């Protein structure tokens, strides 16, 4: 009979493993795991973005050879991507800058 007794307190369920995996992915990706628990949906979007980047890199190599002297344009593309990713923060920062500017003007007038 002792063989039939199973200690369930030390067993790890599949659900627990999935939750732990989501937490690890969240930490690695720097963002929250999908609320619906379907990580494939979010990863699918990420994979699509990666495919576009690869296509741009392949096409971009030819352009780089033609425009070796115009390195500024390459840097501009990276800046635009960074701004697009943080567009909401940039808008919030602009509002803060306006407030700071107004404060500086009133301080100068005094």
Swiss-Prot record:
The Swiss-Prot or TrEMBL record annotates one GO molecular function as: histone binding
Q: Where are stretches of biased composition, namely Basic and acidic residues? A: 13-31, 100-110
| Domain of life, source organism | Eukaryota
Sites of the modification Phosphoserine?
A: 2, 9-10
| Compositionally biased intervals (Low complexity) | 32-41
Region feature Disordered, mapped onto this chain:
1-110
Q: Where is this cross-link: Glycyl lysine isopeptide (Lys-Gly) (interchain with G-Cter in SUMO2)?
A: 102
PTM info: Covalently linked to a small RNA of about 20 nucleotides.
Question: Where is the protein found, in the record's own terms?
Answer: Nucleus
Query: Where is it mainly found?
Result: nucleus
Q: Name the UniProt key words of this record, in alphabetical order.
A: Acetylation, Isopeptide bond, Nucleus, Phosphoprotein, Ubl conjugation
Spell out the Acidic residues composition-biased ranges.
Answer: 42-83
Q: Which residues carry this modification: N-acetylserine?
A: 2
Identify residues that carry N6-succinyllysine.
15
**N-acetylmethionine modified-residue sites:** 1
One family name in Pfam for this protein: Prothymosin
Family named by the database record = Belongs to the pro/parathymosin family.
Quaternary assembly? Interacts with NUPR1; regulates apoptotic process.
What is this protein's record name? Prothymosin alpha
The scientific name of the source species is: Bos taurus
Provide the taxonomic classification: Eukaryota, Metazoa, Chordata, Craniata, Vertebrata
Gene name of the encoded protein: PTMA
């Amino acid at each position: 009979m002792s063989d039939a007794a199973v200690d369930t307190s030390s067993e790890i369920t599949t659900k627990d493993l999935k939750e732990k995996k989501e937490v690890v992915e969240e930490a690695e990706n720097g963002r929250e795991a999908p609320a619906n628990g379907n990580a494939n949906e979010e990863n699918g979007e990420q994979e699509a973005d990666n495919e576009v980047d690869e296509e741009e890199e392949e096409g971009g190599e030819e352009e780089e050879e033609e425009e070796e002297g115009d390195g500024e344009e390459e840097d501009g593309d990276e800046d635009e991507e960074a701004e697009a990713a943080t567009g909401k923060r940039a808008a919030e920062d602009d509002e803060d800058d306006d407030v700071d500017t107004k404060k500086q003007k009133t301080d100068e007038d005094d």
